[in-house]
């Protein structure tokens, strides 16, 4: 690379990733093969449109790549329809929402502070700006989704669309119950499985594909692919929907809202990376990987509990959990900064019914996907949890410096993918 400034910054980031314990639940490490595809000459090609229907010439091989990605996605998820063009999960959600409802319609989504996502109706996001939004949350007592309460809220607000899915909910989501609620109030159901896609395809979480009208996901996180989005559908893929005043099959509406509705040319180099990720996730080794992610995450959560920390909802069924720090002197922001000083990376996170602002937060979110990709097992994950607890309870900078040395020495033994 001739650009020394960028090269040196990339090298610094490479060293940071190697010498830090990565616990951000939305992050993971891709394979070298995926990185090679994303960094390939495919970035040169413009390919507006879809296979065999492009607005540019020279797309014959691009058509083959996208068709292969679609085929693998459908096989992996058991879907009848897949659009692999969304640049991100947020853009996948935007296109999916626009295919199902119109501006001014009503959306019922999960409260952001209870584990939802910005694109599920937040007032600062397109979903809350162009649509009328209502929210459900978790029970104050159990910190679990109360489906009876969701039904009650749905009957009160009569949404056109219900969004199921979360960014910081550590328990299994019952998508069938959400579909029953949606049918009860004549609403569409969109399931956002960005965080749990890997668990679903590996068989460790119930699938939304034949339950929801549309399912969206990112292709990174637990799926371990390149950064990007995807839209899927099962048995409802050809259901007729009212789109711009005309009846259209759902898949046609989605294709239109992705391109030209929300995007121009697809990122072909990323689509190639997605295709590789889907192939990797179809292997038996991926099921073993996800099983280990869940084991590692549970081990860490249980250790925190044994050390007197409260875990939101009491535990985890997936790849993440929230630690409640409200009884300590630390905010989530304090803990995030402190832990980064000892080479442990995670994020501050609001907890249900949080009294602190999101910029401070009362909790931290911990995920096990990335460390598992580096080969950490349950014993190693227990050591990670011990590092965190020691750092949170440290009384001096000398202690923190010692912990950092131990963290670096520990994590260097695990290769990057």
Swiss-Prot record:
Main localization of the protein described in the UniProt heading: cytoplasm
Q: Which family does it belong to?
A: Belongs to the SHMT family.
Using the UniProt record, name the top-level EC class of this enzyme in a single word: transferase
Q: Which GO terms describe its biological process?
A: glycine biosynthetic process from serine; tetrahydrofolate interconversion
- Annotated localization: Cytoplasm
Q: Which Pfam families match?
A: SHMT
Q: Which GO terms describe its molecular function?
A: glycine hydroxymethyltransferase activity; pyridoxal phosphate binding
Q: How does it assemble?
A: Homodimer.
Name used for this protein in its record = Serine hydroxymethyltransferase
* Organism of derivation: Borreliella burgdorferi (strain ATCC 35210 / DSM 4680 / CIP 102532 / B31)
PROSITE patterns reported in the protein's UniProt record: SHMT
Marked site, Plays an important role in substrate specificity, at 220
Question: Per UniProt, which keywords does this protein have?
Answer: Amino-acid biosynthesis, Cytoplasm, One-carbon metabolism, Pyridoxal phosphate, Transferase
Q: Which cofactor does it need?
A: pyridoxal 5'-phosphate
- HAMAP family reported for this sequence: SHMT
Q: Which GO terms describe its cellular component?
A: cytosol
**Residue numbers of N6-(pyridoxal phosphate)lysine PTMs:** 221
Pathway noted in the entry: One-carbon metabolism; tetrahydrofolate interconversion; Amino-acid biosynthesis; glycine biosynthesis; glycine from L-serine: step 1/1
So what does this one do? Catalyzes the reversible interconversion of serine and glycine with tetrahydrofolate (THF) serving as the one-carbon carrier. This reaction serves as the major source of one-carbon groups required for the biosynthesis of purines, thymidylate, methionine, and other important biomolecules. Also exhibits THF-independent aldolase activity toward beta-hydroxyamino acids, producing glycine and aldehydes, via a retro-aldol mechanism.
């Amino acid at each position: 690379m001739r650009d020394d400034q960028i090269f040196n910054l990339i090298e610094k980031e490479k060293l940071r990733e190697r010498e830090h314990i990565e616990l951000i639940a939305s992050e993971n490490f891709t394979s070298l093969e995926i990185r090679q595809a994303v960094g390939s000459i495919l970035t040169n090609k413009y390919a507006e449109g879809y296979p065999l229907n492009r607005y540019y010439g020279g797309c014959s091989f691009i058509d083959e790549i996208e068709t292969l990605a679609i085929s693998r996605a459908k096989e992996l998820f058991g879907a009848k329809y897949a659009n692999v063009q969304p640049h991100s999960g947020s853009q996948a959600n935007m296109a999916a929402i626009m295919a199902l409802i119109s501006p001014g319609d009503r959306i019922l989504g999960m409260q952001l502070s209870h584990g939802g996502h910005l694109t599920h109706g937040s007032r600062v996001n397109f979903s809350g700006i162009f649509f009328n939004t209502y929210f459900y949350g978790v029970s104050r007592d159990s910190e679990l989704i109360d489906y009876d309460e969701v039904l009650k809220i749905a009957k009160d607000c009569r949404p056109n669309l219900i969004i199921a899915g979360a960014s910081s909910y550590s328990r299994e989501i019952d998508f069938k119950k959400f579909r029953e609620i949606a049918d009860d109030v004549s609403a569409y159901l969109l399931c956002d499985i960005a965080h749990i896609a890997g668990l679903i395809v590996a068989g460790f979480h119930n699938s939304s594909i034949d339950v929801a009208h549309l399912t969206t996901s990112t292709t990174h996180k637990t799926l371990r692919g390149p950064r990007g989005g995807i839209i899927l559908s099962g048995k409802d893929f050809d259901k007729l929907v009212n789109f711009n005043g005309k009846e259209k099959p759902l898949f046609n509406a989605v294709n239109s809202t992705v391109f030209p509705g929300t995007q121009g040319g697809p990122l072909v180099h990323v689509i190639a990376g997605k295709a590789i990720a889907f192939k990797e996730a179809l292997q038996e080794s991926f099921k073993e990987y996800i099983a280990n992610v869940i084991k590692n995450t549970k081990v860490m959560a249980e250790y925190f509990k044994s050390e007197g920390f409260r875990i939101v909802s009491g535990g985890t069924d997936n790849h993440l959990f929230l630690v409640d720090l409200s009884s300590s002197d630390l905010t989530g922001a304090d803990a995030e900064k402190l832990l980064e000083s000892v080479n442990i990376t995670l994020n501050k996170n609001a907890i249900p019914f949080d009294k602190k602002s999101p910029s401070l937060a009362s909790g931290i979110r911990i995920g096990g996907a990335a460390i598992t990709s580096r080969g950490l097992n349950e014993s190693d994950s227990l050591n990670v949890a011990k590092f965190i607890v020691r750092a949170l309870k440290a009384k001096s900078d000398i202690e923190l410096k010692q912990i950092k040395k131990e963290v670096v020495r520990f994590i260097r033994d695990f290769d990057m993918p």
